[in-house]
């Protein structure tokens, strides 16, 4: 309890160094100021001349719901430890920063209804360390967590059971950086939320997660405890609506739906081949982007999922080449040699573009691209059946998060017997799309964009919300 009081006093002192000036009423200024911090779950630059992140998209949707006259300004602080002090100084109307609801924080701010549950876990290097089985195995080891996080609160409670437990708090390193240090052998353990671990494991496959620490925590937006409650009430109403109409699930799937699709060995192999095989074909992927407008890294991800960048790959059904084209598709696209890497890559990219054009205008990005990839794998006719089935099941046929629930049902007689195109192995396109999404994310982090000398196409934004397109 004494430590809790000290922590609260420290936060209040930080907030009171400057005399807080009242923030202008947003109903007058029509501007909503939101404090957040950089991170994969909050707010980041996606590389497509767009900002992205689950919190970013939620805030954009919320402000859009307030009315067209309202705008949003993001106040981005260096790390999570600065978020609540900034809010207490009245520099923002609320905080959208992947904040867990904790006892300490509830003394300082007012939380909205939660919109996500997360589980804290111990992160370790599975090449250097055995998974700890209990808290005792963390003693006398190097543990670090970011300052000002709920992780340190959790460790403090564990210390009551194991007084010898010790750790350091880093004011300038976030969870991403600390997990990277664990992966590189510079740190024994850190603590992170499961959804963040799943994302980072796609870049560091040697990371393991174990020991669920306590019960799952809830994530919410934070508002000042005092002052007018108009915006707070609007935010609660917003979360009630998006929880009921599927928008929240749609956004969560956009950022985390593909995160745990691949096994560590898949990621390791992909990274190795990115170093050895990808350079041979990069020029061809660049050319495919220049001809179609598709991000070259997306085309490369499709090619890897199809053939592992093996231009001689052939299936038992005679699907062949880098992009695994059927004879019929190759003929329609004018391909004379499916084993020719250039012909295959460019034809495959053109085919994805053709499929995107077939999809109704009601389907926006990035869902439009994910559905085109599903059609690439299973055929456009079966995709249409899945969309029809989704609608029958009271799901949204324009959202990938719902269509991917309907696709596996195409293999069940009670469903496929009622559809025009009948049976299909609908689970395959779900695996295909989610794997491509993950490979694309990895490449987008590791490889720079390609900017043609004479850009003539717009590249779909596959990170942020909505159907925004940005010139690359």
UniProtKB/Swiss-Prot annotation:
It catalyses: Exolytic cleavage of the (1->4)-beta-glycosidic linkage between N-acetylmuramic acid (MurNAc) and N-acetylglucosamine (GlcNAc) residues in peptidoglycan, from either the reducing or the non-reducing ends of the peptidoglycan chains, with concomitant formation of a 1,6-anhydrobond in the MurNAc residue. Gene3D superfamilies: 1.10.530.10, Periplasmic binding protein-like II. Residues 260-472 are annotated as: LT domain. Keywords: Cell outer membrane, Cell wall biogenesis/degradation, Lyase, Membrane, Signal. Pfam families: SBP_bac_3, SLT. It is a peripheral membrane protein. SMART domains: PBPb. SUPFAM superfamilies: Lysozyme-like, Periplasmic binding protein-like II. It is found in: Cell outer membrane. GO terms for molecular function: peptidoglycan lytic transglycosylase activity. Its EC number is 4.2.2.n1. Its main location: membrane. The N-terminal domain does not have lytic activity and probably modulates enzymatic activity. The C-terminal domain is the catalytic active domain. In the N-terminal section; belongs to the bacterial solute-binding protein 3 family. In the C-terminal section; belongs to the transglycosylase Slt family. This is Membrane-bound lytic murein transglycosylase F. It comes from Methylobacillus flagellatus (strain ATCC 51484 / DSM 6875 / VKM B-1610 / KT). The gene is mltF.
């Amino acid at each position: 309890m004494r430590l809790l009081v000290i922590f609260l006093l420290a936060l209040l002192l930080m907030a009171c160094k400057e005399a807080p000036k009242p923030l202008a009423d947003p109903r007058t200024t029509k501007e909503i100021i939101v404090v957040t911090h950089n991170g994969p779950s909050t707010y980041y630059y996606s590389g497509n001349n767009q900002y992205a992140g689950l919190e970013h998209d939620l805030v954009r949707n919320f402000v859009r719901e307030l009315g067209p006259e309202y705008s949003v300004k993001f106040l981005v602080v260096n790390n999570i430890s600065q978020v609540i002090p900034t809010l207490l100084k009245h520099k923002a109307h609320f905080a959208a920063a992947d904040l867990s609801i904790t006892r300490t924080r509830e003394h300082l701010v007012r939380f909205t209804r939660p919109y996500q549950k997360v589980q804290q876990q111990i992160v370790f290097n599975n090449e250097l360390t055995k998974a700890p089985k209990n808290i005792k195995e963390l003693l006398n080891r190097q543990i670090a967590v970011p300052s000002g996080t709920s992780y340190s609160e959790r460790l403090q409670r564990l210390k009551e059971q194991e007084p010898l437990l010790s750790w350091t708090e880093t004011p300038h390193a976030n969870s991403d950086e600390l997990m990277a240090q664990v992966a590189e052998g510079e740190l024994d353990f850190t603590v992170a939320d499961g959804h963040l671990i799943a994302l980072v494991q796609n870049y560091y496959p040697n990371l393991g997660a174990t020991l669920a620490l306590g019960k799952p925590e809830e994530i919410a937006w934070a508002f000042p405890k005092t002052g007018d409650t108009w915006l707070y009430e609007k935010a609660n109403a917003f979360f009630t609506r998006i929880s009921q109409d599927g928008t929240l699930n749609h956004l969560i799937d956009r950022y985390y739906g593909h995160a745990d699709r691949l096994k560590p060995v898949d990621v390791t192999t992909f990274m190795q081949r990115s170093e050895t095989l990808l350079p041979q074909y990069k020029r061809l992927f660049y050319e495919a982007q220049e001809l179609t407008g598709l991000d070259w890294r997306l085309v490369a991800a499709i090619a890897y999922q199809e053939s592992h960048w093996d231009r001689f790959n052939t299936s038992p059904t005679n699907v062949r080449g880098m992009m695994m084209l059927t004879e019929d598709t190759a003929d329609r696209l004018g391909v004379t040699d499916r084993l020719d890497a250039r012909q295959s890559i460019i034809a495959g990219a053109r085919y994805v573009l053709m499929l995107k054009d077939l999809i109704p205008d009601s389907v926006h990005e990035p869902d439009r691209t994910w559905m085109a990839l599903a059609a690439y794998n299973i055929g456009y006719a079966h995709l249409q059946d899945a969309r029809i089935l989704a609608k029958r099941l009271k799901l949204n046929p324009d959202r990938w998060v719902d269509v991917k629930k309907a696709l596996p049902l195409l293999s069940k007689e009670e469903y496929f017997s009622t559809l025009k195109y009948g049976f299909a192995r609908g689970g395959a396109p779900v695996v295909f799309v989610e794997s491509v999404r993950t490979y694309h994310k990895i490449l987008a982090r590791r490889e720079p964009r390609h900017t043609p000398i004479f850009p003539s196409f717009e590249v779909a934004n596959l990170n942020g919300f909505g159907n925004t397109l940005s010139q690359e």
